[in-house]
Amino acid sequence: MLLVVLYHVWIGKVSGGVDVFLFISAFLLSLSFMRKINEGKALNLLAYWTHVFARLLPAAAVVIVLTLAASLTILPALYWNARAVDAQASLFYYQNWNLANGAVNYFAQGISDKSPFQHFWSLSIQGQSFLLWPILFAVAAFLVHRVRFKPVPAAVTVFGTVFMTSFAFSIWETKQISAYAYFDTRTRLWEFAIGTLLAAMTLKWKPHHVRTRVVMGWVGALGLVTCGAVLPVERIYRLNELSLATWRCGPCSPARW
């Protein structure tokens, strides 16, 4: 999120920080599930959902309530209903769809057009993915325990399919309705899928070649910070995922499969 703030406030460009946010969220979530599948442990989806949203919702609810209160105090009554709708959409993790269906253009908005809840769109996509991803891991676990796949090939099959489908749809919809595509969960799932695929690969990767790890880590970190400044990331498919993969793989190198 620091990338988003720095680029929006001081540089005036899109940083790709949201892509970083989604990628890392998926990577960390997936490490836990991949270890459970690899060790033959129960996934306990309900317990996971309860734990995650019990952690996320209280802080989000406080921000939403305070933002709504400030909006009703500061803004004219003309805007109150719209802000109440935004607050509800943010609380229940569908703010991205609320903005997409409201024909909001992220890149063409004036200050007066922006909602104080707009930043919840990326958190909404994260929340939706936190609901969907455990189900997909359950499918991967089924392939492992019933179809006799190994854990990594099972994950690659499930999440590779998600990646290819989402990426292809993202290209198509961005060409058709770029403003809608920006907020569409379906055009963002491939970013989550990359994080998961990398997490799966770490089960087969071991530390090796210290200098290579250090160089890859710094190259990836530099790419993360500078992609938004050098490239028109608001118009092309971001290289942030490549930079992230390089950064995350810095501590790893391939071992025998």
Predicted stretch roles:
Residues 1-257:
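Membrane-interface helix/loop caps of multi-pass membrane proteins
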